[in-house]
Amino acid sequence: MDMKDFGTITSSLELSKMFEYENPFDFKKPTVQMLGRWQPWHDGHTKLFEKALTLTGQVVIMVREVYGIEGDAGAGRTVAQTDNPFGEIAVIDGIKKGLGDAGYEEGREYMIMAVPNIVDISYGRGVGYTFTEHDLGKDVHEISATKIRAKMREEGKL
């Protein structure tokens, strides 16, 4: 799809059709953004999604393109996130499976968007949105993608 195609869009329904969603995702409705590596998607991410969904009723999950990245932590980061064994398609498939198993439908409650390796979000004052960190409790915070990847390696699945 060429970017010029977006110039003729007159409604979120038309935009939803371009993304092949059967149930229109309302592009004008307030929406929560979740940005991450999701290496891999796990139950803690699903709990975060469910919390985010309560805020507006729809969520855009942004998948950072980080497959195979080594080295530099990036702008303003103190710790490099270099263990990125899953490519974009595998990550997106994992998100769809995890949320599908929990009863959520892409295009209704959420959409997935691949984005560059975003390492900083800059904004000015009065921009009309907030940054929210959700405390999901000790049990959820103990779920660790690092531990999941280590176990997958031990079992020869990665």
Map each language-model feature to its residues.
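Nucleotidyltransferase catalytic core that binds NTPs
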Residues: 2-158
